[in-house]
């Protein structure tokens, strides 16, 4: 079975290339990376940075994930990414996508040992406030989640 880290690489990493000037980039890549098997994945982001740079995000700005989990991290700088969004008229098995190249901060969820990206959470134009500067209850909850019940 594909590991979460390997799935992240397959679905989100496209180092050393870009989508610029290729309106068919998403149609080609979504198919090539098996995100149109059985259904059309509606939205997906490819990151055009080195795997090392993306792995490094796991030690950058700790923020809350969209699902409320505390193991998300936002990049310190913007990254070259491509957003792929299924067009309204396309239906499986003929998945069609709109390709948009952008420079944005990325947010990934990290897990494991080594601590690596396992989920692409979001991309934004403006950086978020890191978790430690949030009000106190969050700190207690985080400590508790880490199994440190000294509070």
Curated annotation (Swiss-Prot):
Taxonomic superkingdom: Eukaryota
EC number: 3.1.27.-
Residues at the active site: 12 (proton acceptor), 119 (proton donor)
Sugar-modified residues: 62, 129, 133
One Pfam family hit: RnaseA
Keywords: Disulfide bond, Endonuclease, Glycoprotein, Hydrolase, Nuclease, Secreted
Annotated localization: Secreted
Keyword Coiled coil listed: no
Compositionally skewed regions (Polar residues) per UniProt: 14-25
Record bears the keyword Secreted: yes
Annotated GO CC locations: extracellular region
PANTHER family in the cross-refs: RIBONUCLEASE, RIBONUCLEASE PANCREATIC
GO terms under biological process: defense response to Gram-positive bacterium
Protein name, UniProt field: Brain ribonuclease
Disulfide bonds: 26-84, 40-95, 58-110, 65-72
Originating gene: BRN
Region described as Disordered: 1-25
């Amino acid at each position: 079975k594909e590991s979460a880290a390997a799935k992240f690489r397959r679905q989100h990493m496209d180092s050393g290339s870009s989508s610029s000037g290729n309106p068919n980039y998403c149609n080609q890549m979504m198919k090539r990376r098996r995100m149109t098997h059985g259904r059309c994945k509606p939205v997906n982001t490819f990151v055009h940075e080195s795997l090392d740079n993306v792995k490094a995000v796991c030690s950058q700005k700790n923020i809350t994930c969209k699902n409320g989990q505390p193991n998300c991290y936002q990049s310190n700088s913007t990254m070259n990414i491509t957003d792929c969004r299924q067009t309204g008229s396309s239906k499986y098995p003929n998945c069609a996508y709109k390709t948009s190249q952008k420079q944005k901060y990325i947010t990934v969820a990290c897990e494991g040992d080594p601590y690596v990206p396992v989920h692409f959470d979001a991309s934004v134009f403006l950086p978020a406030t890191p978790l430690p500067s949030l009000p106190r209850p969050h700190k207690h909850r985080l400590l508790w989640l880490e199994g440190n019940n000294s509070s």
